[in-house]
Amino acid sequence: MEKSMYNSLKSILDKYQELNQELLKPEVLSDIKLYKKFSRELNSIKSISEEFSKYLNYEKTIESSKIILAQEKDEELISLAKKEILECEEKMSSLVEELKILLLPKDKNDELDVIMEIRGAAGGDEANIFAGDLFEMYSKWANNNNMKVSVLDRNYATSGGFTLIVFTISGEKAYSKLKFESGVHRVQRIPVTESKGRVHTSTATVTAMPEIDDDIEVEINPSDLKIDTFRSSGAGGQSVNTTDSAVRITHIPTGIISSSQEGRSQISNRELALKILKAKLYDHENQKKLEKVGQYRKLAGSGARSEKIRTYNYPQDRVTDHRINFSSSLKQIMEGKLQIIIDSLLAEEQAEKIKEVGI
């Protein structure tokens, strides 16, 4: 292992051990915000620290075996020591390659939960129904992975599904697993109302944004906000509340809009709408920064939310992700077995990073 790599790993391991000690301190245990901050830092370097610890243990074993070789006369012990050295060297060589991968640049938001926004797009009623199907797909995936789904806002469509639904998925590295879902999802199928059996094409747009926690500052000037209230509506568009409890917030400088009617009061809806707005503004700034330094990768495509990323072909029972030219069973994917696509996308991301840093 190169000395520079060894020193980097040693610094990370020292930090990991330091954070473990910090998390045991009473002042940290009593401060939820600080505890969450340290826990997130710890989790972000846990894997690499554990693998480097294994490397160091193999290093110590080799040193001990070399002492045996230098001092022992017994041929059997010498043979065992040589064998152990060879085995440890092989394992260390393998670990070096793993550690190179773990040292690759990481998205600072990967540890966060995710806010998903799905909108029915081209195709009228069928697009809205498909938006509902996508929500069910992500909900089933979350359930399969012991993650929690919480709806922040939704507008029911008259023929089923949603014109818009916004929800969080909370769980281990939720954003890292769903960040490549942003883009246009296209569906090809025969609508229930189609009498001639023709296949229709419709689309829904998905936006995946990191959920902002207390550690991340998003500056919002109250004077930049336009806040409107309106009555909550349910399925079919009927009013479900006699008071103006739903809240819509417009960020005037960017034109970004967020809303919520899921809460039981205007106050709770305002908090939810503000939560969505913060995520949108944070995501907006991140997109601008990436665009400025030209860091869009193949998986992010052009960075445009209008880019078609996936097709769901019902007649052929096939889902195709166009960015990696990967196809899978539609039935399984819609049942929430999305991990096969997620893993393929993450593998492609890793390959791109390796190419960039020249490993």
From Swiss-Prot:
The modification N5-methylglutamine is found at residue 238. Its main location: cytoplasm. SMART domains: PCRF. Methylated by PrmC. Methylation increases the termination efficiency of RF1. The keyword Cytoplasm applies. It comes from the Bacteria. One of its GO terms (cellular component) is cytoplasm. Keywords: Cytoplasm, Methylation, Protein biosynthesis. It is found in: Cytoplasm. Pfam families: PCRF, RF-1. One of its GO terms (molecular function) is translation release factor activity, codon specific. InterPro entries: PCRF, Pep_chain_release_fac_I, Pep_chain_release_fac_I_sf, Prokaryotic/Mito_RF, RF-1. Signal peptide: none annotated. PANTHER family: LD18447P. Belongs to the prokaryotic/mitochondrial release factor family. Peptide chain release factor 1 directs the termination of translation in response to the peptide chain termination codons UAG and UAA. This is Peptide chain release factor 1. The gene is prfA.
